[in-house]
Amino acid sequence: MNSTKVSKRILALDILRGVTIAGMIMVNNPGSWGHIYAPLRHAEWNGLTPTDLVFPFFMFIMGISTYISLKKYNFEFNHAAGMKILKRTIVIFLIGMAIGWFSRFCYYWASAPDDLSFGEKLWASVWTFDRIRILGVMQRLALCYGAASIIALTMKHKHIPYLIAGLLTGYFILLMCGNGFAYNETNILSVVDRAILTPAHMYKDNGIDPEGLLSTIPAIAHVLLGFCVGRLMLDGNKSEDRASFLNSQLITLFLVGVILTFSGFLLSYGCPINKKIWSPTYVLVTCGLASSFLALLIWIIDVKGYKKWSMFFEAFGVNPLFMYVLGGVLSILFGSISFPWGDSSISIHGFLYNIVLMPVFGETAGSLAFALLFIAINWCIGYQLYKRKIYIKI
């Protein structure tokens, strides 16, 4: 990210990436799913909560990062670029499936009937492919990265905004014609997912898989929007000094954020904001808010120089996908590894929440305290990598 005229390195990008990863880990790991503060819950169906922002914020930043990473290929599709995209897409997708398999293995092993032999227990724990979820967060990241990267290398960049508009408009028409705003199995998204993926390989939520096949279409547009903002930030800015460069970025990001957010909320009267179907208005509003938040971070960190507080999130941001995977693996281990306690046994998760935190903070505050403690444990590992300048690229 260097220019012969001015350094275009933006620390705020790493910090926002780290904030979103820490946020994703936090909302996925409460002490008790039955005791969560309202802002830390996903919207039941239509609507938006702070929790609904963390994943789309990361995808927006992925779009900007994709622009930066593909720039070294001069945005020309060649063998090296194609193989890099293909390899990374496959690796991220398979890691997502591996996490799903690992979760089933650990939890079945921990709860298997006592009358099974070791071999039967091992086989039953290992062979869960007949009911493993095919899609998920990592899989969506993989598909969106792969599709957006290929588009960026094969299409004139000035035409990408029209493609984004076409994808979102076409998806809205699909939702309108296919009962796409219904929270049940008559929804076209559910119909397609159940026909292709089959229910055994889907997330169970009234027949709706929040990372399903058709809703990947607007998610690709989401990453492309981030790509376009990255292009506007880094190549649309010809400032001769860093201060002017950063100030110009602030204005650009803020204006883009206001326009997208206002447009999304305005259109939400006809197209509800909905994360589970990744509605077009959800794309506009979350990209707009991400752009505005990035502008705020650039002003605080890169312009004003208030950086000391940001080191915590930078430890997450420099190894984002690794830290997310680490959080998923630790969550599975905390929930499935048990030890004797009294007349029965208790998991690490259960011990920390029920025995250590809940008696001190209460049910809901204790649930939040567990999530924060879990983030701190992940950070300790991430910080060791950050301190040693170890960057694990996935």
Task: Describe the predicted segments one by one.
Residues 1-394:
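Alpha-helical transmembrane segments and their immediate juxtamembrane cytosolic regions
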